[in-house]
Amino acid sequence: MAHLTARKGFAELANRLNRFPQGAPPSEYLYKILSVLMSEEEASLIAQLPIKPFTSKKAAGIWKVSEVKAVRILENLADRVLLLDMTIKGEKHYVLPPPMAGFFEFSMMRTRGDIDQKLLSELFYQYITVEEDFIKALFVNGETQLGRTFVNEDTIPRDSDLFVYDYEKVSKVIETAEHMGVSMCYCRHKMQHLGKNCDAPMDICMTFGTVADSLIRHGFARRVGKEEGLELLAEAYENNLVQFGENVQHEVSFICNCCGCCCEAMIAARKFGLMNPVHTSNFMPEIVHNDCTGCGKCVEVCPVEAMSLVSANNPVKPRYKKADIDEDRCLGCGVCVRVCPAQCISMEPRKKRVITPVNSVHKAVMMSIERGGLEHLIFDNRALSSHRAMAAIIGSVLKLPPVKKVLAAEQIKSRYLGRLIEKKSGL
């Protein structure tokens, strides 16, 4: 790791961010990113905030300032989407988003004049793509990942016997969301500043629910209705973009429409494909090899290089090729089905279904256990002041398989919680 020269406030926040389930390994580049986005004083204040939603009164108590001053600071941070804000039971709350998916992306989801976005893009590229510690922590360390692939619904015939659950459909996420926003694609916008972007649509990044509502109110997303949302999805399909969204069944907060060249999830899937950095869909392409003409269109559009042309073993035409699938790398997105002129590729169910966490709490608990950081989630900065938050986390732990419960108990090292897990699990 490079020599760290960050000042105290940025170092405090870097350590704080690294306690999120997905982590944010300290780095010279991380400190530089933070220094572009905020002052050292702001970094020190943010570092003291809990993971769970909190009120201005709570922040004032933590910072030891008046509530009026706390509100002024919090609103300024929310205006720059370093914090998100929302109303819970009639009372305004704030929450510190993780770096990704979170304030890293938010910083590039519109054109801004208050920060140097070109410099920021270069720093993101170095920290995320070149150094690799962050991307490995985000996409590789553990079985449960941040995001998952949604199958292209147009590749599943309506008269097919295949069953697609509602939580596997982007269309259902759009149709059922209370709020939906669309913003600039963080990945392609970043690459644009580096002179490496492709010509895929830029304004097509989707957010939902309370995240979308906060981004919309602060000018980082444009509110769209269900009809326009479905039109944007159709546009993404037309451009052979992959739908990569939050790895939860309920209350999905984001869906990115990813190209293979710019988008970090797809880059990670190519680099670390055998480690399953992105959860796949529950479908897999199947090729009728006798009908394959070897045109290579599926190879061209596959974002993770899971498709290739191999010898057709045709003695009459020894140079003849056919498409082949690397099942260990395939995300099950379906873009290959859409472009096949011979219509010899179809989507079929995977032999083993992929388990999707129920909600964000379930996902966070699973990620924390697998990455050895559950104690950070539970004994976070004053997080236990909320019995509701504690109950949600313990409830998710108690629903885990026995092996995961044992791992959780070992990590927490709390007599009370350990005994509770043992009692409920019969261990």
Which residue ranges define each predicted feature?
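Short amphipathic alpha-helical interaction segments
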Residues: 63-79
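Catalytic cores of enzyme domains
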Residues: 129-284, 316
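Short, amphipathic alpha-helical interaction segments positioned at domain boundaries
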Residues: 91-131
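Long, low-complexity, charged/polar intrinsically disordered regions in eukaryotic proteins
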Residues: 1-31
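Flanking helices and flexible, charged tails adjoining ferredoxin-like Fe-S electron-transfer domains
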Residues: 318-427
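A short, conserved structural fragment
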Residues: 78-89, 307-308, 345-346
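Short acidic, hydrophobic short linear motifs in intrinsically disordered regions
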Residues: 52-63
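Ferredoxin-like iron-sulfur electron-transfer modules
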Residues: 96, 242-250, 254, 272-301, ...
